[in-house]
Regions:
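ABC ATPase nucleotide-binding domain
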Residues: 9, 29, 65, 351-353
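The feature captures the beta-strand-to-loop junction immediately N-terminal to the Walker
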Residues: 39-41
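ABC ATPase nucleotide-binding domain helices that frame the ATP-binding cleft
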Residues: 47-50, 146
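Helix-to-loop junction immediately C-terminal to a conserved catalytic motif
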Residues: 54
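Conserved ABC transporter NBD signature motif
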Residues: 62-70
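ABC ATPase nucleotide-binding domains
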Residues: 76-82, 86, 90-233
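Glycine/charge-rich catalytic "coupling/switch" loops of P-loop NTPases
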Residues: 227, 256-258, 262-314, 342-371
């Protein structure tokens, strides 16, 4: 999908509020028909970026293009984008039909065309049975679809969504997440979706843009972001439980390259050149996900296991199908994930294996991935 020509082009976008940088030098292409998620913690700049695309905030610097037209000087109504707010902004006293028709009537569209377009959108979003109901009497799913339909009916080229599922209870959020993704696939519209919820971004987005303190940390597919985080921030932000981090020192012993933390060490001969080139100080942060630390008694894929390491079990948190286990080794407390059926208790000693093929390496000075 991302091979399609870009429909949105952001070039060196910057936004300051009273001298505080909210968005710094953001450049991005969004492909036609793509579902891209802007992900990051509160205050990272993701909503500000969305509002600049919509025309609700004026960039301090940079350009915004929609296809071959530069739109950042234009008012919101002339940009060809639709914005779906977190609170839906419906007219509660009006019917679903009148909510859908409102934008067209304001634009002076003829009654016949208004009716045709409203009914077309209502059918595509399965709203036909509730068109005459007041918005205040709709269930949350229908409210979501009316808010989306009200934007679709004016035929925007791009849909911008600012945390539209934020007010839903967890179970309903999962249902609506799937419904929204299905709608996007069936309509084929380009969507830019802002969320602080990594599960939403990783399950819905064709690509995910991760932001932190106004800067883009990484733009990639969900799979690549999880498997190959580009920065220390992305590595720690993506994944639950979070990645374990261990400060190490690069050493060469008998011609072999190692990363060492006290008595712990990992041979990294295949990554030696990258470490020497990208971490000249010799200091390296090793990251390993909890699921890549395994009890030695459980099967580990051949050729990927590391050395067996005795640890002390500090805490066991049982979940539905797995357990999160805190283990102590030397001065470290690491998290690991085991199957829910695996018997383990706090206080016992356990032999574990850290999968050396799953180590992530970071330069503590640049905070970027090595290799």
């Amino acid at each position: 999908m991302t091979d399609a020509p870009p429909i949105i082009r952001l070039r060196h976008l910057r936004k300051e509020f009273d001298g505080t940088i909210a968005v710094a030098d953001l450049t991005l292409d969004v492909a036609e028909g793509e579902f891209i998620c802007f992900l990051g913690p509160s205050g990272c700049g993701k909503t500000t970026t969305l509002r600049m695309i919509a025309g609700l905030e004026r960039p301090t610097a940079g350009e915004i293009w929609l296809r071959e037209r530069r739109i950042d000087p234009l008012p919101p109504q002339q940009r060809g984008v639709g914005f779906v707010f977190q609170n839906y902004a419906l007219f509660w006293h009006m019917s679903a039909y009148d909510n859908l028709a409102f934008g067209l009537r304001v634009r002076g569209v003829s009654p016949a065309e208004v009716d045709a377009r409203v009914r077309e959108v209502a059918e595509s979003l399965e709203l036909t049975p509730v068109l005459r109901q007041r918005a205040s009497r709709l269930d949350l799913s229908a409210m979501q679809r009316v808010a989306l339909g009200r934007t679709l009916v004016v035929q925007p080229q791009v849909l911008l969504l600012d945390e539209p599922l934020n007010n839903f209870r967890p179970g309903l959020r999962e249902v609506m997440r799937g419904e929204l993704k299905r709608m996007q696939l069936s309509l084929g519209r380009t969507m830019v979706y802002v969320t602080h919820d990594q599960e939403e971004a990783m399950t819905m987005g064709d690509r995910v843009l991760v932001m932190h303190e106004g800067r883009v940390e990484q733009v990639a597919t969900p799979r690549e972001i999880y498997r190959r985080p580009a920065t220390l921030f992305v590595a720690g932000f993506i994944g639950r439980p979070a990645m374990n981090f261990i400060e190490t020192q690069y050493q060469v012993e008998d011609g072999r390259a190692f990363l060492r933390h006290d008595a712990l060490r990992w041979e990294i001969e295949t990554r030696r050149e990258a470490v020497e080139r990208q971490a000249p100080s010799g200091r390296v942060i090793v990251g390993i996900r909890p699921e890549d630390i395994r009890p030695a008694v459980l099967a580990v894929p051949e050729g990927r296991r590391g050395e067996t390491l005795p640890v002390q079990v500090d805490l066991v948190q049982p979940l539905a199908r797995r357990k999160i286990v805190d283990v102590k080794v030397l001065d470290l407390v690491l998290k690991m994930v085991v199957p829910g059926t695996f018997r383990v208790d706090a206080g016992q000693t356990l032999d574990v294996v850290m999968d050396r093929g799953a180590l992530h390496l970071f330069d503590p000075q640049t905070l970027r991935a090595i290799g």
